[in-house]
């Protein structure tokens, strides 16, 4: 047991011895591909050459190793590359893959490899470089590898170049990178990363920057100067050949680089950057003075001037820095080398019956099998590897020399020529072949092709030169056209801006106008306005008919406003005849007209119609004006005085009593009188609610007319003559009770007239007769009551 423990310790210290021991246990031989670099103390091999059974001893040795400073495992297997093969049945071709799939491509082998690397990273204190190139690493493989990265105490460089881990795999790896205290450089070239992967790396930079600032603050206490180079964190990030990083990834790096003081190199070759991404990086360099390498070459979308400005700014930062971080060699096209394929030249030395000597100058390839004799040039071309004596195939040097002489006897003449050609850089092969017609034709054709080749090349060069000149000329024309087009576009944009401003101002004006016209465009609003004007002018017509034109003039209404709409005037409910209006105007102009003239006017009104009395609309009278109107009516009736009225009251009642008593026809029944009285009362009640304000002016204007027309019944008014009427009018009012009776009668008369105006014209005469009968009957009753009171 103790010997086994000692053996494991010794094997951990010596990789090669432990690997040989494990191979001997399974009856296998250590692979030459693995042993090749072990002499230098590193493990570097091509994983495609190992079979599945060869991986077990290697991984077991790697898991416990502690002395290897570098582990590099590579795979160049490309399954999409095949070989073109002709089918047996026809000319169709297809690609087949003749190479077997290596064992490292399997899930189990890759997982076991990552577990072995995790163990090596955990226990080794000298492993500084870990390179995995072209391996297929899955999620669980990366998770296992990340655990080893976080535990490593010596790893400085990590490379996963050409491993298609993608953004998800990089995110897993970043979990181990951000907590590593020794890792300084990472290489993710060709890992199928996008701008999201670049964002993951930018977050790692920000995280490490925060931790470094904390360490810097701690190291700066007591006036100490912190050493930034000795702090942990990444110093170089290589993301070449990830074309999907683009400007978004460059912007993410620019954001993190603006405050970073530790990153020294950032490689972004062939990452799909444009001038916008380069501009963002250039802005970050304005504040970052520690970045000495920012490689954005091989990005054709970046403007040449922008790339030059970025590189110039980076070189200014690197003047005072050391040369620890160098620019990565740009992946350029392979230069022609000695192994490149060259055109073969054939020189015919001569021909005879026995044969011809042919010299081919060019790349020495495998000689196809032929029936002709092929011999070497002699001593200069014959250099066999020396074999130890006793080995199979051993030939003494003297015997070999005699064989050379016998072979070179037929080529003595060509030896001098071959020595002359050997001075050149081209390999020379000299063969002697038997003459044949086909070979002679081939020789002639080849000689002709040697002469025609330079001519064809010169013709092609001239053609290409002409095309180049034509393209340059077209490019110049296109540039001129482009400048004109840009100028025209700028002019059109200016005109478009002006037209847009004009359109905006016009739209605002139209909008304001539409708001004002929107109300007037409505038919309902126009109709309501028209109706309001019609009602207003009708009201003005009523004022004019009522004789209140002066009131309208005082209110500021011009006489031209009357009859504005050209429609018939809206008079009172019953139109007054022209003669009646003239009679009323005469009464107002001549207040002291004789009683005979007044009686004739009243008689004329009774004959035509009782409903033709105009209704004044001066309803807004104050009590003072009402009293003045009453006084004026008394003056028109010729009232002499209060004493004379009281003295002649009894005589007036005696004179008028018999006619009033006899004025009622004897043939009327009691029922007919009740109906008439009820009708008169109902009409008076209806009219009192509508025309109460207009009662007093009408009653005061015509007190005598109401008295005389109501005092005489319709039957007796025709029988009486003009003389009786005059005597009746000329008698004075002698008592106060008669005044009350007259005022009550005037009010009833106004009520009857207002009730007539509400009803229609066909029933006008009928209502007037009933009102006259009712009013006569009431007058008789009130006269009798006043007589009893006196």
From Swiss-Prot:
Which SMART domains does the record match to this protein? LRR_RI
Q: In which tissues is it expressed?
A: Expressed by photoreceptor cells in the retina.
Q: This protein's superkingdom?
A: Eukaryota
Q: Which Pfam families match?
A: LRR_6 (PF13516)
Where is it localised? Cytoplasm, Cytoskeleton, Microtubule organizing center, Centrosome; Cytoplasm, Cytoskeleton, Microtubule organizing center, Centrosome, Centriole; Cytoplasm, Cytoskeleton, Cilium basal body
Q: Where is this region: Disordered?
A: 325-345, 362-385, 428-462, 654-732, 756-790
Phenotype upon knockout?
Male mice are sterile due to aberrant sperm morphology and almost null sperm motility. Sperm flagella show impaired microtubule arrangements and elongated centrioles. Mice also display defects in retina and outer hair cells of the cochlea.
Q: Per the record, GO CC terms?
A: centriole; centrosome; ciliary basal body; cytoplasm
UniProt biased composition (Low complexity): 428-438
| Location, primary (coarse class) | cytoplasm
Biased composition (Basic and acidic residues) is annotated at 693-708, 721-732
Tell me the keywords, alphabetical order.
Cell projection, Cilium, Cilium biogenesis/degradation, Coiled coil, Cytoplasm, Cytoskeleton, Phosphoprotein
Residue ranges of coiled coil:
455-510
- Listed GO biological process terms: cilium organization; flagellated sperm motility; negative regulation of protein ubiquitination; protein localization to centrosome; protein localization to cilium
InterPro entries, alphabetized: Cep78, Leu-rich_rpt, LRR_dom_sf
- The answer to whether UniProt assigns keyword Cytoplasm to this entry is yes
Q: Subunit structure, briefly?
A: Interacts with PLK4. Interacts with FAM161A. Interacts with IFT20; regulating IFT20 stability and localization. Interacts with TTC21A; regulating TTC21A stability and localization. Interacts with USP16; promoting USP16-dependent deubiquitination of tektins. Interacts with DCAF1/VPRBP; promoting localization of the EDVP complex to centrosomes. Interacts with CEP350; promoting CEP78 localization to centrosome and centriole.
Annotated function: Centriole wall protein that localizes to mature centrioles and regulates centriole and cilia biogenesis. Involved in centrosome duplication: required for efficient PLK4 centrosomal localization and PLK4-induced overduplication of centrioles. Involved in cilium biogenesis and controls cilium length. Acts as a regulator of protein stability by preventing ubiquitination of centrosomal proteins, such as CCP110 and tektins. Associates with the EDVP complex, preventing ubiquitination and degradation of CCP110.
Which family is this sequence assigned to? Belongs to the CEP78 family.
According to UniProt, the name of this protein is Centrosomal protein of 78 kDa
Organism the protein comes from: Mus musculus (Mouse)
């Amino acid at each position: 047991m103790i010997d086994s423990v000692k053996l494991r310790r010794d094997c951990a210290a010596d990789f090669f011895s432990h690997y040989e021991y494990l191979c001997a246990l399974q009856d296998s031989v250590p692979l030459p591909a693995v042993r090749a670099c072990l002499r230098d103390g590193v493990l570097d091999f091509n994983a495609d050459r190992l079979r599945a059974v060869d991986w077990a001893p290697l991984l077991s040795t790697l898991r416990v190793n502690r002395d290897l400073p570098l582990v590099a495992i590579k795979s160049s297997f490309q399954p999409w590359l095949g070989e073109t093969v002709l089918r047996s049945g026809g000319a169709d071709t297809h690609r087949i893959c003749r190479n077997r799939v290596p064992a490292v491509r399997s899930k189990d082998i890759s997982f076991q490899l990552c577990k072995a690397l995790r163990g090596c990273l955990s226990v080794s204190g000298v492993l500084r470089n870990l390179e995995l190139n072209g391996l297929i690493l899955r999620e669980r493989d990366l998770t296992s590898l990340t655990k080893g990265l976080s535990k490593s105490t010596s790893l400085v460089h990590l490379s996963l170049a050409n491993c298609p881990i993608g953004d998800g795999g990089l995110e897993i790896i970043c979990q181990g990178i951000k907590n590593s205290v020794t890792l300084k450089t990472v290489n993710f070239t060709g890992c199928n990363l996008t701008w999201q992967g670049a964002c993951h790396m930018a977050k790692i930079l920000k995280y490490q920057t925060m931790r470094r600032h904390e360490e810097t603050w701690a190291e700066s206490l007591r006036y100490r100067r912190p050493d930034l180079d000795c702090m942990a964190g990444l110093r170089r990030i290589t993301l070449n050949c990830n074309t999907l990083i683009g400007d978004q990834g460059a912007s993410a790096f620019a954001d993190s680089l603006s405050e970073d003081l530790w990153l020294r190199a950032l490689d972004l070759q062939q990452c799909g950057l444009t001038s916008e991404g380069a501009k963002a990086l250039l802005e970050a360099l304005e504040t970052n003075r520690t970045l000495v390498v920012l490689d954005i070459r091989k990005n054709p979308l970046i403007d040449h001037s922008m790339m030059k400005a970025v590189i110039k700014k980076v070189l200014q930062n690197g003047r005072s820095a050391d040369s620890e971080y160098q620019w990565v060699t740009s992946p350029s096209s392979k230069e022609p080398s000695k192994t490149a394929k060259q055109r073969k030249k054939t020189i015919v030395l001569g021909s005879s019956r026995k044969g011809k000597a042919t010299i081919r100058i060019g790349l020495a390839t495998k000689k196809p099998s032929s029936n002709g004799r092929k011999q070497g040039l002699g001593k200069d071309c014959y250099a066999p590897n020396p074999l130890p004596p006793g080995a199979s195939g051993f030939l003494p040097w003297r015997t070999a020399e005699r064989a050379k002489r016998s072979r070179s006897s037929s080529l003595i003449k060509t030896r001098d020529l071959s020595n002359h050609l050997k001075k050149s850089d081209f390999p020379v092969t000299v063969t002697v072949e038997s003459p044949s017609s086909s070979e002679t034709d081939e020789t002639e054709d080849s000689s002709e092709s040697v002469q025609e080749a330079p001519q064809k090349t010169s013709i092609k060069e001239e053609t290409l030169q002409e095309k180049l000149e034509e393209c340059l000329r077209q490019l110049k024309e296109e540039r001129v056209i482009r400048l004109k087009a840009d100028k025209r576009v700028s002019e059109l944009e200016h005109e478009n801006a002006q037209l847009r401003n004009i359109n905006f101002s016009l739209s605002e004006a139209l909008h304001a106008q539409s708001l004002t016209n929107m109300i007037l465009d409505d038919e309902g609003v126009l109709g309501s306005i028209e109706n309001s004007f019609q009602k207003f002018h009708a009201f003005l017509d009523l004022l004019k008919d009522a004789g209140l034109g002066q009131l309208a003039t005082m209110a500021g209404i011009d006489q031209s406003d009357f009859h504005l709409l050209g429609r018939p005037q809206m008079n009172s409910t019953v139109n007054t005849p022209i003669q009646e209006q003239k009679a009323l105007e005469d009464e107002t102009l001549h207040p002291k007209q004789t009683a005979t003239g007044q009686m004739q006017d009243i008689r004329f009104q009774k004959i035509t119609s009782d409903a033709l009395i105009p209704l004044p609309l001066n309803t807004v009278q104050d009590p003072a004006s009402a009293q003045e109107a009453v006084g004026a009516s008394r003056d028109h009736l010729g009232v002499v005085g209060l004493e004379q009225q009281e003295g002649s009251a009894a005589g007036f009642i005696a004179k008028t009593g018999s006619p009033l008593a006899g004025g009622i026809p004897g043939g009327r029944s009691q029922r007919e009188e009740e109906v008439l009285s009820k009708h008169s009362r109902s009409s008076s009640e209806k009219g009192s609610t509508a025309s109460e304000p207009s009662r007093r002016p009408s009653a005061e204007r015509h007190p005598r007319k109401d008295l005389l027309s109501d005092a005489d019944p319709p039957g007796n008014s025709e029988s009486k003559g003009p003389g009786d009427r005059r005597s009746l009018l000329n008698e004075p009012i002698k008592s106060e009770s008669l005044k009350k009776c007259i005022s009550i009668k005037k009010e009833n008369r106004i009520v009857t007239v207002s009730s007539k105006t509400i009803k229609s014209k066909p029933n006008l005469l009928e209502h007037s007769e009933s009102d006259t009968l009712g009013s006569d009957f009431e007058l008789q009753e009130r006269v009798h009551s006043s007589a009893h009171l006196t």
